[in-house]
Amino acid sequence: MEKSSIYGLTWTKLTEWLEAHGQKKFRATQVWDWLYRKRVKTFEEMSNVPKETIELLTANFVMNTLEEQVVQESTDGTTKYLFKLSDGNLIETVMMKQEYGLSVCVTTQVGCNIGCTFCASGLLKKSRDLTAGEIVEQIMNVQHYLDGRNLEERVSHVVVMGIGEPFDNYDNVMDFLRVINHDKGLAIGARHITVSTSGLAPRIIDFANEDFQVNLAISLHAPNNELRTSIMRINKTYSIEKLMEAIHYYVNKTNRRITFEYIMLKGVNDHKKEALELAALLGEHRHLAYVNLIPYNPVDEHIDYERSTKEDVLAFYDTLKKNGINCVIRREHGTDIDAACGQLRSKQIKRVGVRERMKQKQAALEE
């Protein structure tokens, strides 16, 4: 039987599991203290936990299902990690240094099926969801990386915007949030956590009904159905009308601000016409709408797309502001490394594929 990651258990699930296996309820407090406060890397280091409990945990769980493969460090402090999972799949995690602290962007799926035509993440289709433990471990690996360098820094913010669609892996993502937000866990404040979705309308409604104060971001990227469908396949299933119905429910239920992500593609969605359409689309909820204009990171496989000029981005920004929409032009991170989400993973898989083909050719020649 393959053991699962101990990091995948929420506080409630760990407590229930320990009690079901004859352990005292307070053992959960001890175990989580070792995992998230002292941040040990083996069960054996949990010195105040009885041997019987240690043996039970060791027999059923592991603490390291991720193996570090590549680390890229940018001159601006951004660090990109490529991890290998226990089944050999590769995922990316990114740490960004912000004025307000350290932010980590986590991956939730191996590959992506959303079908955004400009994105590196979808170059390889989804093969499976990540477990809650595999998502939490991304944060823990980054934190261990910081601890190992005696930097005395901690991950203070989390964005669920890496490879995959978080709401397509809903239950595992919710457990991940419960772990990192819990005051006995990583204790990352809910207002410091943002979950991004490409627009799974039913799950936006589910998310509104959760007991979280976590921020929500919508990957919108176009203000009308024709344009959005041409660059985001998901719009065929959940049109802008369906998406806005879900957003209306979310806003009325939570009264929380929503960030709308809008990637700027030269000659595609960056005209004044689209800016005016976007302002009109968000007009009803402009007091809780916040638009994040994102400079495009070119992807080798998507040669049809280029980043908008600075002049066009500024003009788009000005049009939104003049029409009462709060917005910002996102600061770029890691431009001197594989900046686009999924790009490092895609390149690594290609390299491995090339090496394997060369090995096969060499073997054939030697036969």
Curated annotation (Swiss-Prot):
Report the cofactor remark: Binds 1 [4Fe-4S] cluster. The cluster is coordinated with 3 cysteines and an exchangeable S-adenosyl-L-methionine.
Q: Which family does it belong to?
A: Belongs to the radical SAM superfamily. RlmN family.
This entry's Gene Ontology molecular function terms read: 4 iron, 4 sulfur cluster binding; metal ion binding; rRNA (adenine(2503)-C2-)-methyltransferase activity; rRNA binding; tRNA (adenine(37)-C2)-methyltransferase activity; tRNA binding
Q: Which cofactor does it need?
A: [4Fe-4S] cluster
The alphabetical list of record keywords is: 4Fe-4S, Cytoplasm, Disulfide bond, Iron, Iron-sulfur, Metal-binding, Methyltransferase, rRNA processing, S-adenosyl-L-methionine, Transferase, tRNA processing
- Locate the active site: E92, C341
> Disulfide connectivity?
C105-C341
The miscellaneous comment for this protein is: Reaction proceeds by a ping-pong mechanism involving intermediate methylation of a conserved cysteine residue.
Which top EC class is named for this enzyme in its record?
transferase
Q: Which Pfam families match?
A: Radical_SAM, RlmN_N
The molecule here is called Probable dual-specificity RNA methyltransferase RlmN
The UniProt record gives the binding positions of S-adenosyl-L-methionine as G164, E165, S196, S219, L220, H221, N297
Q: Which organism is it from?
A: Listeria welshimeri serovar 6b (strain ATCC 35897 / DSM 20650 / CCUG 15529 / CIP 8149 / NCTC 11857 / SLCC 5334 / V8)
> Which InterPro entries does the UniProt entry name for this protein?
Aldolase_TIM (IPR013785), Methyltransferase_A (IPR040072), RlmN_N (IPR048641), RNA_MTrfase_RlmN (IPR027492), rRNA_lsu_MTrfase_RlmN/Cfr (IPR004383), rSAM (IPR007197)
The EC number(s) attached to this protein equal: 2.1.1.192
| Main location group | cytoplasm
**Localization:** Cytoplasm
